[in-house]
Amino acid sequence: MSVDDLPPSSASAVTPLGSSVIPIVNKLQDIFAQLGSQSTIALPQVAVVGSQSSGKSSVLEALVGRDFLPRGNDICTRRPLRLQLVQTKPSSDGGSDEEWGEFLHHDPVRRIYDFSEIRREIEAETNRVSGENKGVSDIPIGLKIFSPNVLDISLVDLPGITKVPVGDQPSDIEARIRTMILTYIKEPSCLILAVSPANTDLANSDALQIAGNADPDGHRTIGVITKLDIMDRGTDARNHLLGKTIPLRLGYVGVVNRSQEDILMNRSIKDALVAEEKFFRSRPVYSGLTDRLGVPQLAKKLNQVLVQHIKALLPSLKSRINNALFATAKEYESYGDITESRGGQGALLLSFITKYCEAYSSTLEGKSKEMSTSELSGGARILYIFQSVFVKSLEEVDPCEDLTADDIRTAIQNATGPRSALFVPDVPFEVLVRRQISRLLDPSLQCARFIFDELVKISHQCMMKELQRFPVLQKRMDEVIGNFLREGLEPSQAMIRDLIEMEMDYINTSHPNFIGGTKAVEQAMQTVKSSRIPHPVARPRDTVEPERTASSGSQIKTRSFLGRQANGIITDQAVPTAADAERPAPAGSTSWSGFSSIFRGSDGQAAAKNNLLNKPFSETTQEVYQNLSTIYLKEPPTILKSSETHSEQESVEIEITKLLLKSYYDIVRKNVEDLVPKAIMHFLVNYTKRELHNVFIEKLYRENLIEELLKEPDELAIKRKRTQETLRILQQANRTLDELPLEAESVERGYKIGSEAKHEELPGTRRSRTETNGNGRLHM
């Protein structure tokens, strides 16, 4: 005999599909209920949604077969009710079967056989949290109903959607209830039982509207049409039940509720089910829809759909529980065990120090287990700073970029003093090269600072997660290594300064890589020749008339009263020497005629000459000085600079100095590029790596500090206890899933979640007879 051949009141007694699957999920719900709002794993369940007074409560009571829910004209369900229906075995002696309820908030859990008491407990628990004046809360109530007359189903009865606030309800009560409902039904693991009354337009159903928001394709929504017996005359719900109005993948089921008069008359649900069957048989319009009509068919459909829904979700459910178990176990491990003995605390502190130092050393050496593959880290960053930042920056510097030709010529002239130099002096070269060497100090010190900053970053990265439970120890370790790194930075910077000063103190021109003077002169001459520097053009006052200078010779030129350049220094006027004044001019010389022309003019030139030749020398000289006025010198300017033009010899000297500077600077630069990283590695990096463990032992591993360092904050103890409880619950849930038999392969494979499922494969919609093949597999 098939299920369809049974009377409606007996349909619930049929052995349900997945009789071991739903109890497992119910057990998981009980397990995760211990976590309360902390539970992040959504279990398969059926959420009942509908507007206020849509008949939700009547449907649930019909599924249970007993009156147990609060009743009234106003909103009755003010907290979510997690309802687990558990089928028990019928009594073997033919006596009355026991039915009872258990509330999960009771500790210890006790059986309640009086369903009126169950109703009162629901009301009391609702008032305890939501208040007595129609307040609403999202904290669920857990209730189990044990009966041989039910199928294994897990439901969540949600508050009805209301429009107008009453009592203490806020003005936005509708929005709050809708938000609460969506938090449940938005989960893909939740089936939606959308309850809509038949005496209202289905297109305006609040239940279908909110279900459509969470399940727009209708893949996990079951429609329930209530109050079919009070529809207007001449109307029926056949098109609704066939899904022609609003299609749903899981279809619709129509039911007849008890009226308010039936409830007041204490009409039993058993009698109501008989009346419901009689109603459908008396309505020819509903013929051929027996698998879509009545509470027994609804119970069977819910059972079948829920079982297959659970089967489809089991793999992902196991995966989520395992992932949560792994993450929670790792978190609990990070909190560590409670160590109260002094010896145990000392060993724990020593283990922290050792682990930290090993992590620090491994990170520097590139042996860390947590090495990044997306970016450079640890010692690789230090090498990058040495090669790609420090060395590259020094190689890009031109030692002569801030030295002009005038700077070099001025240095050469200053080095010669009052004498003219026959060769390029070495003093200006040393002065200039020292100045360029000193420029290497700042980038070298900056390189050491960069490495220090990298070591500080590494020290922070090596802080183990276990240290979070000891904030005092973590802070002290951070302080110790910070001070220790600074202590290593100081000698490394001092060594860098010494290296630069050593290079400045001794200019080794005998270095085998130094260009040398001979080669420098050759290159300088070639450079000057190729540049074709024109000869300097003398200013007008520096020029002597050709006819007066033709026979004077070089001696007359160098002793001319006219303006000249002495040792490259510009002077403003010519000054005669005593020798010039006393020495007679050679025959044919024009010096004196030039000298007299400056002071006496050209008209008296011949007379003055004859007069001088006819007088004795002493008389002539005395007369000359008597006739000449006193000559006053201009004071030299405060700052003297080289002339704007320079000779070919000066160009060669400048070019030689530049070549010598570049050659020796390259030697020093290479020395600095090699020695500065070595100094930093020796005094800072390797020193801290070698001595860090000893420093921690010296600074922290003290008997009078251990207890203070290993003191846990109060909130950490709370976290450890909560995590331990979560771990226990997840382990229990994992063991519960392991108890699940291989029934997943024994149910119909037609039910799928997603767009691949087809309407014609729905269980309980076309074929309801259960057949078993030779392999023991079930087919619907």
Swiss-Prot record:
Region feature Disordered, mapped onto this chain: 536-558, 573-592, 753-780
Ranges that cross the membrane: none
Alphabetical UniProt keywords: Acetylation, Cell cycle, Cell division, GTP-binding, Hydrolase, Mitochondrion, Motor protein, Nucleotide-binding, Peroxisome, Peroxisome biogenesis
Phenotypic effect of disruption: Reduced plant growth. Increase in the size of peroxisomes and decrease in the number of peroxisomes per cell.
Biological process per Gene Ontology, one example term: cell division
A Pfam family per the record: GED
Domain GED: 654-745
Domain of life: Eukaryota
Biased composition annotated in UniProt, kind: Basic and acidic residues: 539-548, 753-770
Protein's cellular compartments: Mitochondrion; Peroxisome
GO molecular function, one term: GTP binding
Biased composition (Polar residues): 549-558, 771-780
Predominant cellular place of this UniProt entry's protein: mitochondrion
Binding-site positions, GTP: 50-57, 157-161, 226-229
Chain intervals for the UniProt region annotation (G3 motif): 157-160
Region (G4 motif): 226-229
Keyword field contains Hydrolase: yes
Family: Belongs to the TRAFAC class dynamin-like GTPase superfamily. Dynamin/Fzo/YdjA family.
Function: Involved in the control of mitochondrial and peroxisomal division and morphology.
Protein name per the record: Dynamin-related protein 3B
Organism: Arabidopsis thaliana (Mouse-ear cress)
